Amino acid sequence: MEKKIAVTAGTFDLLHPGHFNTLNFAKKHADELVVIIARDETVKKIKGRSPVIPEEQRKIMIEALKPVDRAVLGSLTNKLEPILEIRPDVIVLGPDQTTYQINELKAQLAEHSLYPEILKVEDYVKCPFHSSYDILKEIVRRWCCKELKV
């Protein structure tokens, strides 16, 4: 019997409970979890800023997490490329993905005769720092005008 493979993707810059929630959710739906790490250049284009942590280091950190079996860097030219190479049975999307984005992804994958189950994490993890951006803002608030004591 073949292993059921799940894929999820993201920047995974400053890790927070939402990342762990998504990874654990994805692993519950498959035997093997492959995580696609967004490239630094791609993040800068989409978010208007580079990640704090470089892509290779983010990949190493994600690979070290318990639910993750393997991490790969995304493509610089075609966001579907790693998905088409992995050919997962399940794709897990975060809670911030819209129905339009999900339907668009299904259509794009169908063009390549790929029909994975697409699952969306519905619940946000409620905590003070539930996004990498919130963590970064808090670091700046606490430390930008103070002398760092090492």
Swiss-Prot record:
**What is the protein name given in its UniProt record?**
FAD synthase
Its family remark reads: Belongs to the archaeal FAD synthase family.
Check the record and name the InterPro entries matching this protein.
Answer: Archaeal_FAD_synthase (IPR050385), Cyt_trans-like (IPR004821), FAD_synth_RibL (IPR024902), Rossmann-like_a/b/a_fold (IPR014729)
What is the primary gene name for this protein? ribL
Asked if the keyword Flavoprotein belongs to this entry, the reply reads yes
Instruction: Provide the taxonomic classification.
Output: Archaea, Methanobacteriati, Methanobacteriota, Methanomada group, Methanococci
What Gene Ontology terms for biological process does this UniProt record contain? FAD biosynthetic process; FMN metabolic process
- Give an example GO molecular function: ATP binding
**Is Transferase set as a keyword in this record?**
yes
Give the EC number(s) listed in the UniProt record: 2.7.7.2
Q: What pathway does the annotation place this protein in?
A: Cofactor biosynthesis; FAD biosynthesis; FAD from FMN: step 1/1
Q: Which key words are in the record?
A: ATP-binding, FAD, Flavoprotein, FMN, Nucleotide-binding, Nucleotidyltransferase, Transferase
Q: Where does ATP bind?
A: 11-12, 16-19, 96, 124
Q: What does this protein do?
A: Catalyzes the transfer of the AMP portion of ATP to flavin mononucleotide (FMN) to produce flavin adenine dinucleotide (FAD) coenzyme.
Q: Which domain of life is it from?
A: Archaea
Query: What is its cofactor?
Result: a divalent metal cation
Self-association or partners: how does it assemble? Homodimer.
Query: Broadest EC class?
Result: transferase
Q: Which residues cross the membrane?
A: none
Name the reaction it catalyses: FMN + ATP + H(+) = FAD + diphosphate
